[in-house]
């Protein structure tokens, strides 16, 4: 192996900053693996234009990068103030009024966009506005009005979000806007579709069904950001199993469960997702200071590194690339942090499912290949010749410290695999089967500079190339 490859993937959000100065191509060249379209912001035409530009760059550079559409979901917000903002003092009484015109907020009251909110609350509940910067205690909730008392005050401006401490708001996971955005996601052919604020597995099943009805085959990502979603281990597992991947959206989740609980929940979610053979993205404020600064803080470096050490498939950038001043520099710095953390030996050994029995042949082959990778001296790489990408995904659930090359002629499969930890997707289209195809794969990777003569590699493949679900062979070959 000539160069150590970065195993943890980087998700970057597109926005005004990537629209200028050739920044989209710069972040792609800097190492982005997934491009995120945040449907909370931007117009339909802007998203389509960015998708077209991204595909042109990917084709020209011969890069395999996944597109991720992120639905806004039922984010509950206050309306607008006549003077754009107010200052709330501790002890003030303040009314949230479901019937107030959306532009008529004042020092005493403001409108809300979720008319059901007064019926979801009881006396004593605590509402968290603007990511918890403002806290209101419910004194009375009747009809269309919620009378509150300010517990933590400060400046409150237009359209700030509302959360309930401990969760429990009944808004549906998919709004009418989300349904329109699923159509948009289908039109730009995203590989992944992120569902915001799911409370249970049924929310994800409904989203998957709706996406398929609109013609999308996108894999479903569950954004974990409600307290109900992490209520207990059974709920966590149900949500993970109903999705193809999860995103730990630490902003709203931290507001609802409390920041002090966040670190433990993050580790539990990552561990559980990997055990259940699902992908996991860690997100929110990872390199926040680089929105306006050319270097991250030491705390941000440690945050990214810890997400890598926890086993995240990917770490995500939001405003850092969408509206920040240093989008490419942020990606470069994050990539360096990931590679630095990946040097730690303790994360390169895994006993995951070492004693498990399998009903699925592909999974058994993947597990056996990774067992050999961790126990036979001299192995330098794992090569999975795959149609659907399933074998590549399964092998990536076992930590070995070795690169996994997913070889396929299916470009959609290669795009999906760009999110899998430790997996490098490579286009490969052989007319041969078995041993000849395996040797062709080795020659290709050696010519690309990934392998050296004399190294040992593990190859998984099926007897017949081009058939989904037919992986039944694992072999060890020497690079010549």
UniProtKB/Swiss-Prot annotation:
InterPro entries: Pyr_Knase, Pyrv/PenolPyrv_kinase-like_dom, Pyrv_kinase-like_dom_sf, Pyrv_Knase-like_insert_dom_sf, Pyrv_Knase_AS, Pyrv_Knase_brl, Pyrv_Knase_C, Pyrv_Knase_C_sf. K(+) binds at residues 38, 40, 70. It comes from the Bacteria. Substrate binds at residues 36, 251-252, 284. ATP binds at residues 38-41, 77, 160. One of its GO terms (molecular function) is kinase activity. Mg(2+) binds at residues 225, 252. Allosterically activated by AMP and by several sugar phosphates. Belongs to type II PK. Pathway: Carbohydrate degradation; glycolysis; pyruvate from D-glyceraldehyde 3-phosphate: step 5/5. Transmembrane segments: none annotated. Homotetramer. This is Pyruvate kinase. The lineage of its organism: Bacteria, Pseudomonadati, Pseudomonadota, Gammaproteobacteria, Enterobacterales.
């Amino acid at each position: 192996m000539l160069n150590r490859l970065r195993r943890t993937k980087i998700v970057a959000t597109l926005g005004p900053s990537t629209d200028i100065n050739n920044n989209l191509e710069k972040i792609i060249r800097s190492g982005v693996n997934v491009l995120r379209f945040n449907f909370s912001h931007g117009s339909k035409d802007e998203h389509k234009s960015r998708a077209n530009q991204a595909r042109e760059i990917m084709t020209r550079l011969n890069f395999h990068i996944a597109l991720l559409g992120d639905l806004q979901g039922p984010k509950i917000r206050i309306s607008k103030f006549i003077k754009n903002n107010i200052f709330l003092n501790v002890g003030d009484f303040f009314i949230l009024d479901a019937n107030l015109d959306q532009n008529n907020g004042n020092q005493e009251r403001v409108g809300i966009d979720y008319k059901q909110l007064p019926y979801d609350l009881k006396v004593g509940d605590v509402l968290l506005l603007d990511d918890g910067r403002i806290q209101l205690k419910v004194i009375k909730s009747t009809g269309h009005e919620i009378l509150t008392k300010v517990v933590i005050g400060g400046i409150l401006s237009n359209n700030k979000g509302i959360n309930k401490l401990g969760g429990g708001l009944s808004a549906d996971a998919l709004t009418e806007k989300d349904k329109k955005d699923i159509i948009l996601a289908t039109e730009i052919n995203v590989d992944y579709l992120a569902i915001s604020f799911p409370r249970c597995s049924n929310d994800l099943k409904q989203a998957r069904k709706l996406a398929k009805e609109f013609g999308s085959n996108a894999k479903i990502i569950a954004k974990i950001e409600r307290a109900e979603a992490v209520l207990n281990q059974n709920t966590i597992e149900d949500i993970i199993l109903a999705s193809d991947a999860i995103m730990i959206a630490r902003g709203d989740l931290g507001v609802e469960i409390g920041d002090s609980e966040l670190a433990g929940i993050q580790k539990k979610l990552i561990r559980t997702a990997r055990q259940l053979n699902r992908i996991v993205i860690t997100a929110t404020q990872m390199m926040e200071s680089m929105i306006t600064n050319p270097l991250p803080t030491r705390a941000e470096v440690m945050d990214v590194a810890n997400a890598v050490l926890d086993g995240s498939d990917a770490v995500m950038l939001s405003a850092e690339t969408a509206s920040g001043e240093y989008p490419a520099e942020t990606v470069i710095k994050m990539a360096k942090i990931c590679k630095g953390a990946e040097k730690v030996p303790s994360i390169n050994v895994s006993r995951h499912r070492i004693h498990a029995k399998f009903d699925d042949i592909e999974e058994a082959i993947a597990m056996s290949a990774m067992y050999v990778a961790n126990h036979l001296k001299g192995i330098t790489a794992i090569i999975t010749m795959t149609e659907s990408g399933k074998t590549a995904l399964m092998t990536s659930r076992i930590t070995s410290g070795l690169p996994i090359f997913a070889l396929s002629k299916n470009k959609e499969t290669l795009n999906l695999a760009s999110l899998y930890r430790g997996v490098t997707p490579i286009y490969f289209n052989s007319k041969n089967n078995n041993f000849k195809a395996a040797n062709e794969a080795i020659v290709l990777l050696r010519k690309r500079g990934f392998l050296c003569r004399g190294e040992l590699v593990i190859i998984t493949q099926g007897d017949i190339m081009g058939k989904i679900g037919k992986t039944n062979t694992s072999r060890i070959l020497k690079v010549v």
